[in-house]
């Protein structure tokens, strides 16, 4: 299970991980799998974790937020839901937008030294999720580049280690969707 806590005092919900609806076949259980990370307390997060991706997308589309970190969680969850439903063009677009939003959040946090390292983890999530989508789209070079960036931002994060290992063994199927109570 991959968990992170956001230190802004906003939402703090326990994180869980589940096997996704697009899990690999039983024969592939021992091989490491790519992992998507969603924000359970972001728009659509609980539905994503329950494997109700269409319902999650509906909830996400209806959600309106004022805070930039809430928007980042929303668009990240949209990226994950589209990837899980194998709508790769939409997933790629959402992942790109989640990355832009996470970068903007990080730039705002750089004013506060303690917030910068936390934001690095959130930015690593955006890169790692986009890497999964790149692997699904059979673009391993772009995926490797994104995972290298994720590793440089959060070298000890479990989702980074798992995705790097999965890439090394050429396993590009999604086995898990993980939630973090970060936004």
Residue ranges and their predicted role:
Residues 28-30, 64-69, 101-120:
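Flexible helix-coil transition and linker loops at the boundaries of alpha-helical arrays
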Residues 36-58, 62-65:
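Alpha-helical segment of the N-proximal tetratricopeptide repeat
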Residues 148-183:
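Terminal, low-structured helical/coil segments at or just beyond the last alpha-helical repeat
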